[in-house]
């Protein structure tokens, strides 16, 4: 059934920040709880695949990329569901799929000692299901938030939903390492099954927003409309992808402790930038903000690549998180303003699909590169992609100036 209730009246321009935040807050809290389950296995999966299942760096990249590939393939459906049936339904379905993914993690853990290949297959199936769930949660939450507060606040919606996601990553990663040490991968699996139930308790009491009226633009046309900002998102997301997939192995390769803190520092930089500068893409324009942010991320990736001690790697994670933080809403503002309201969910799905493309392709490619050059080389790749995103931001800025 469709979501049936519209948001309250928009506040006056002079008092927009607090009412907008309060309307987004319940969604952000639910997304935080849901993505805590995604963050738990982040530092654990590379160790589990490389160690308990005795696979190599390439398979680590494939397992990491499986979730993102599945998310990519489900984006069109997620956007269509949010537009046709309501964003609330999409979010609820996403959390249920996340819990189902945990059941496959449990199966993988049960098979690991005697049938490692079957365990790997179950793990990959769980990652694929999690990818579909993540797609529905993110697309639905973004569409729901923009429906509540209006497209003029799209940057704030993306900013605060993003804060929830990366705060969950930042806290979930060290918690996952502790849980893995205490209860093994089975503990991670049970947590993945149960945590979405908490998120559902937060989401179900919330009122939805009506699907916007009007003619819906076909998804392939929406994809074309958001192509350029989506390319910027794809390039700037590679740095995030190589941190999530390979940082534990980089620290092991260099004989360092504290890999889980890289996720915390990345998340900390991400959150601080969002807290203090969330409104900049709406105020200054997405292209201008993106131009600065991707340069900061490139510096962070360079520090991780060249670091001789963990301190410099920690600094690189902080800068990478801060730079990536506003790049997502900055490019996203440019995407939203290109599509009609009736296709907003499809636009969110199409835009975030570029993140999936980046992570689904970059993780296996980075795994191949790591096998040739070592794990440090993947951060040179992340920095080069961030510099490529600068070129996209310059192109977007030129188009905005030409249209003015």
What are these regions, as identified by a protein language model?
Residues 32, 116-136, 312-326:
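Hydrophobic core of transmembrane alpha-helices in multi-pass small-molecule transporters
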Residues 96-116, 296-308:
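C-terminal ends and interior cores of transmembrane alpha-helices
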Residues 22-63, 68, 232, 238-250, ...:
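Helix-loop boundary and gating motifs at the non-cytosolic
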Residues 193-212, 392-397:
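C-terminal membrane-cytosol helix-exit motif in multi-pass small-molecule transporters
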């Amino acid at each position: 059934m469709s979501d049936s209730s519209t948001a309250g009246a928009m506040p006056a321009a002079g008092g927009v920040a607090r009412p907008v935040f309060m309307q987004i807050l319940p969604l952000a809290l639910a997304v935080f709880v849901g993505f805590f389950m995604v963050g738990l296995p982040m530092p654990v999966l590379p160790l589990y695949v490389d160690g308990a299942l005795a696979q190599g760096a390439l398979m680590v990249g494939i397992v990491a990329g499986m979730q993102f590939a599945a998310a990519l393939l489900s984006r069109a459906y997620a956007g269509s569901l949010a537009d046709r049936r309501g964003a609330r339904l999409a979010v609820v379905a996403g959390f249920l799929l996340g819990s189902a993914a945990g059941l496959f993690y449990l199966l993988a853990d049960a098979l690991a000692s005697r049938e490692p290949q079957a365990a790997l297959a179950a793990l990959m199936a769980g990652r694929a299901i999690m990818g579909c769930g993540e797609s529905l949660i993110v697309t639905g939450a973004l569409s729901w938030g923009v429906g509540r507060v209006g497209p003029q606040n799209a940057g704030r919606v993306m900013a605060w939903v993003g804060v929830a996601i990366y705060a969950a990553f930042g806290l979930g990663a060290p918690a996952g390492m502790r849980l893995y040490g205490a209860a093994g991968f089975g503990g991670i699996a049970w947590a993945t099954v149960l945590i979405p139930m908490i998120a559902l308790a937060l989401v179900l009491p919330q009122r939805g927003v009506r699907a916007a009226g009007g003619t819906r633009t076909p998804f392939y046309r929406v994809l074309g409309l958001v192509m350029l900002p989506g390319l910027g998102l794809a390039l700037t997301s590679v740095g995030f992808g190589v941190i999530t997939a390979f940082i534990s192995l980089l620290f092991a390769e260099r004989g360092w402790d504290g890999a889980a803190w890289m996720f915390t520092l990345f998340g900390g930089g991400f959150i601080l930038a969002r807290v203090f500068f969330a409104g900049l893409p709406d105020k200054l324009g997405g292209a201008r903000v993106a131009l600065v942010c991707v340069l900061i991320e490139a510096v962070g990736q360079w520090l991780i690549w060249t670091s001789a001690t963990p301190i410099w790697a920690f600094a690189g994670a902080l800068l990478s998180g801060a730079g990536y933080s506003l790049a997502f809403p900055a490019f996203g503002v440019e995407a939203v303003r290109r599509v009609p309201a009736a296709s907003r969910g499809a636009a969110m799905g199409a835009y975030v699909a570029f993140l999936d493309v980046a992570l689904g392709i970059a993780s296996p490619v980075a795994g191949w590169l790591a096998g040739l050059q070592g794990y440090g080389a993947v951060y040179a790749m992340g920095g080069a992609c961030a510099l490529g995103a600068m070129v996209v931001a310059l192109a977007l800025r030129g188009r905005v100036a030409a249209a003015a």
